[in-house]
Amino acid sequence: MERPSLIFILITFMVLSHVVTSFNKMSKKKARPELNMAHASLDDQYDGCMASMKRLLPSLFRSELNASTLYSEAWEKALFEWQENKTWLYPRKLEELSEVALYAYTLGYPPLYQEFNSATRTAAKGPEEYAAYPFKSLHFLLTWATRFLGKKFSCQRVYRGTGVNFSVGHYFRFGQFTSTSEDPEIAQFFQTVTYFKLVTCKGIGISEASYFQHEQEVLVPPYEMFKVTSVEKHPTNKTIMAVSVGTCSDHNCIFVGEVLKYTKRCQDHQVLYL
């Protein structure tokens, strides 16, 4: 009598485990990442401390390259690509360092952009997260690039296709440096579970400093804020139309220990498009 009872218990346990696992998988499928104001992201614009950051950059940059194989390998490959169009071997000023940073960010392999974006989305969650953030130098160089480098335009329509089913706030920021394209067909080439039609006023054209120059890439910074104007829902995807409404930062000059002096703080907005 004991053996059948044991078998029954084991079978019951296996069935329940399968049900729980299936439920968890279904829950994960239904979960929709929310695009909101991304308060935990590192949105530092370095207002008022550019000179200080420039002075501290060499030692910070060297220490981070030495600490990260991914970062150092991506930088080495990016430097090689950058040198192809130069008559000198190494960057001589901040502008040229930022150009190499853009090459490194846009590389398909090694995929620095994946780890960098993921870390940037939570790097300002708290002091411990910022201390552990391994890309402070890259963040500064890309921020400098989006503010002072690249093709300048007042505002421009760009497009982005993603394989993620986002829910979105009435106002949102991407919370990371975000690649978009001037060409809608290029953006549609990527997975388009959520397709963005954006008007950006802070993004910069980086085709000349991108590893994939044919993509007509425009880089949108994490501190640019967008207002959703409409959402078109389809059976398998959605299109989100949004326009730039300026910039805001919850954090400024963290590395040098300064406080918010110049930047606009970010407010919460609760209306959601599911």
PLM regions and their residue ranges:
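ADP-ribosyltransferase catalytic core
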Residues: 168-255
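Intrinsically disordered, low-complexity terminal/linker regions enriched in Pro/Ser/Gly
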Residues: 249-274
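A positional/structural detector of protein chain ends, strongest at the extreme C-terminus
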Residues: 1-4, 272-274
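Internal glycine-rich, Lys/Arg-flanked active-site/core loops of soluble domains
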Residues: 50-51, 55-204
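Short N-terminal segments immediately surrounding and downstream of signal-peptide cleavage
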Residues: 24-45
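Cleavable N-terminal signal peptides of Sec/SRP-targeted secreted and luminal proteins
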Residues: 3-22
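Intrinsically disordered, low-complexity segments enriched in glycine/proline and serine/threonine
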Residues: 5, 28-33, 118, 211, ...
